[in-house]
Each structure stands twice: as C-alpha cells, then as structure tokens.
C-alpha cells in the first residue's frame, strides 16, 4: 500500500479546522448548522468496482514538444507556434446565449478576492477496492495551491481517511458539511477550489436531467453505510448558491466523472461546445449490445438496451432541461478525469502513487503557467496520451471563451 506524503503539512496544521483541542465535539463546524443525519444508502447504492489499477509498466510523463509548448493560433489556421499570453477574462457581465433564457447573464471572476479550498482524498484503507494515490494527490495539490496560487493553509480543509481527527475523515456527513463551508458567504472575485480523488460511479437518473439516463456519484469512505453522493446534490450545494463573479474551480479525479457537477457546457479539444449526437450514441449502444450478447453477458445486453431506449426517448429533452436548470451566473469550471462512461487510472510518478488527472493538472500548470482553458485541456490530455484510455473533460456553468487565460 502506498501511503507516503511527498510534502507533509507543517506541525499543528489541521487543514482549516479549529485547533485540535477544540475539534471534537465541535459546537458548530464550518459555522453553519450540521447537515441532517444520513440514513441508510438507497437500494441502488453499490460498491465501486476495482478500477484505477496500476498500469504495467508504470508510465512516464509524455515527451516534451520541441518548444516549451506548442498551441495552434486562435481561429482555423493549421500552423503551430508558441502563442502570446492569452487575454484575461472580461469583468463586465456576459450574455448566456446557447439556448439559455435571453435575460440570463453571467460574470467571469478576476480571482483577486478571498481564496478557499476543499481537498478530499480517499484511499478506502482496509476496504476491498483500496486505492493508493488519492491521499498523495491531496497532499501534492495543497502544496501546489499554496506555492503557486497563494492559497493559505488555514483556508484549506483537508479530508483524508488516514487522519485521527473524526472531523477530518471523508465520511458522507463531513464531505457535505465541508462543501457547504466551501461556498458559504462567497463574494464576487473570490476563488474557491474543490479537489476530489477517489472512487466514482453511476446510478440511475431519477429527475430526467441526464442524457444517458445515469447520474454521476462519488463514494465517501463510509459509503457502505451512508450511501454515495449524487451529482444533483453537489450541484445544489456548491453551484446553485454562488453569486455572479465567484469562481469555483473543480478537479474530479475519479471514474465516471465527466459531468460530476452537472455543468451544462462541455467543450471539446477544439474548443467546440459539445452537443449530444444521439444517432451516433445509439449506434454505439447497439454495437455494445451485440458484443455483450456474443460474450454471453446478458446483464450487459439489458443495461445497454435500457440506455438505448432512454436516450432515444428523452435525450434531447434532458439536454434542454440541463441547460435551462443547471446554468449559473457564477464562474464554475471543472476538469474531470474521464468521460461519464470511462474509468480513471492511478499512476506512479516521482516515487509515489498518484491519480492520473491530479498529476497531469499540476504538471501542466507548473510547466506552462500561462495557458488558456483550451490549451490547458489539451496539455492535460497530452500528458496522458498513449498511456490511458481516459479522456479528461472540461465543463463550465456558462458558455466559456476557451481562449481566455486560465486563472484561479
């Protein structure tokens, strides 16, 4: 089991919680009422599969390009060159367009205000589907945020399953409370950051907002008792309350995490807003059903058939429902480790286990700190290209000019 920390926190650092002698029992953790007690998990809760296994042999970072980093010119030119620093986000309110109500406006964040971070790493120590790199991910991310972006240690909440303090264990109740703490009293131009490294999965969609008929979920350390956390709930806690101009940057390094916050605007590596192609997806489903039948996997046939029928019946309406109900005037940007249908991988870098997306995100910004959103998406993918099947995703709560400078 890999359980090393490359940059341990300083003595006495408790990740933003009250001093250790005051932590338990807390009068009111995070300065808001405690989250309601969690009941037993719903019937469709299931253990995450044993994914994120190590590749063999362990991969090395992708080779460097000839120049520091080569990006295409904006526009349609096929020539490649090193670009100037991308423009910073505009400060005035922007129109949504793209199918949202005509009166909707959103505002980019200058990220000049207060900074606050919630970092969650779960190795599921002692459980059947134990991971090895998630706690290391959180340790490395906290150091990166502190050194490169000025996040103060006292403004970070760290939840990992190797801690002694009960408030710092990533249980479902602690995670939900910490998510509320993260966005509480956020003001325009504040910069909030959420990082989750652990198991993710899927569960049948109950409110009709998912094109594929499934909600994305994350698994707390006590998921067998308390159940998982659904993307709709995370959206309602962390996205819906935010004011215009508040930035929330999210890194989900988990399986099936493509739309883990239900952000309606998803972008391709060409900077194009993705629209669902139901005909193509239906054809893929049909091929999958035939393959499952040939392998004798009758459950796979059934699941694929259900997905095919749901897409055919409500795909377009789900897309419109998501755009109309999940947009936000705030500035929420998410990089996720894989598409909704993919798993994410652990890797081994710098002498320790790491999550592939967490490692690639930090490495890309250390090497090329002044990238646009589109360049960052492509440089993250370049780090993983040829070594993993997962395809990191970029999504946003509003239409995003992907050629603007990535700020945080």
Swiss-Prot record:
Keyword Chloroplast: no
GO cellular component labels: cytoplasm
Cysteines paired by S-S bonds: none
Protein name in the entry: Metacaspase-1B
Composition bias, Pro residues: 24-49, 56-66
PANTHER family registered for this protein in UniProt: METACASPASE (EUROFUNG), METACASPASE-4
Chain's role: Involved in cell death (apoptosis). Required for the apoptotic-like loss of membrane phospholipid asymmetry at stationary phase and facilitates growth under conditions of endoplasmic reticulum stress.
Signal peptide (UniProt feature, chain positions): none
GO biological process, one term: proteolysis
Similarity-based family: Belongs to the peptidase C14B family.
Assigned EC number: 3.4.22.-
Active site: 199, 255
Key word Amino-acid biosynthesis present: no
Protein origin, superkingdom: Eukaryota
Pfam hit, one: Peptidase_C14
Keywords: Apoptosis, Hydrolase, Protease, Thiol protease, Zymogen
Entry GO MF terms: cysteine-type endopeptidase activity
Spans annotated as Disordered: 1-98
């Amino acid at each position: 089991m890999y359980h090393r920390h490359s940059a341990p926190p300083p003595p006495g650092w408790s990740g933003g919680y009250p001093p250790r002698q005051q932590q338990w029992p807390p009068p009111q953790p995070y300065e808001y009422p405690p989250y309601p007690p969690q009941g037993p998990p719903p019937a469709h809760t299931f253990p995450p599969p044993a994914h994120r296994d190590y590749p063999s042999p362990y991969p090395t970072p992708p080779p460097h390009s000839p120049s520091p980093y080569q990006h295409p010119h904006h526009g349609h030119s096929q020539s490649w060159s090193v670009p100037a620093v991308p423009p910073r986000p505009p400060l005035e309110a922007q129109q949504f367009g793209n199918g949202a109500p005509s009166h909707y406006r959103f505002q980019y964040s200058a990220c000049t205000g207060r900074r606050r971070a919630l970092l969650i790493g779960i190795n599921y120590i002692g459980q059947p589907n134990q991971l090895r790199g998630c706690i290391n991910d959180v340790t490395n991310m906290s150091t990166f945020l502190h050194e490169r972006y000025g996040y103060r240690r006292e403004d970070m909440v760290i939840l990992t399953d190797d801690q002694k303090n009960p408030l710092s264990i990533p249980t479902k109740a602690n995670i939900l409370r910490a998510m509320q703490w993260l966005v509480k009293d956020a003001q325009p131009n504040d910069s909030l950051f959420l990082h989750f490294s652990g198991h993710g999965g899927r569960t049948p969609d109950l409110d009709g907002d998912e094109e594929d008929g499934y909600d994305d979920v994350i698994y707390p350390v006590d998921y067998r008792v308390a159940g998982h956390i659904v993307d709709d709930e995370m959206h309602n806690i962390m996205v819906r309350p935010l004011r215009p101009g508040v930035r929330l940057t999210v890194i989900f390094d988990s399986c099936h995490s493509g739309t883990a916050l239900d952000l309606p605007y998803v972008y391709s590596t060409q900077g194009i807003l993705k629209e669902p192609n139901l005909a193509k997806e239906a054809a893929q489903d049909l091929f999958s059903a035939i393959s499952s039948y040939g392998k004798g996997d009758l459950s796979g046939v059934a699941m694929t058939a259900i997905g095919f029928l749901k897409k055919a019946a409500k795909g377009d309406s789900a897309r419109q429902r998501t755009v109309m109900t999940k947009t936000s005037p705030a500035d929420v940007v998410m990089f996720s480790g894989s598409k909704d249908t993919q798993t994410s991988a652990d890797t081994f870098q710098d002498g320790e286990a790491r999550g592939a997306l967490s490692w690639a995100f930090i490495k890309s910004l250390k090497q090329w700190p002044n990238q646009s959103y589109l360049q960052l998406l492509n440089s993250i993918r370049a780090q993983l290209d040829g070594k993993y099947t997962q395809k990191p995703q970029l999504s946003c709560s509003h239409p995003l000019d992907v050629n603007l400078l990535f700020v945080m």
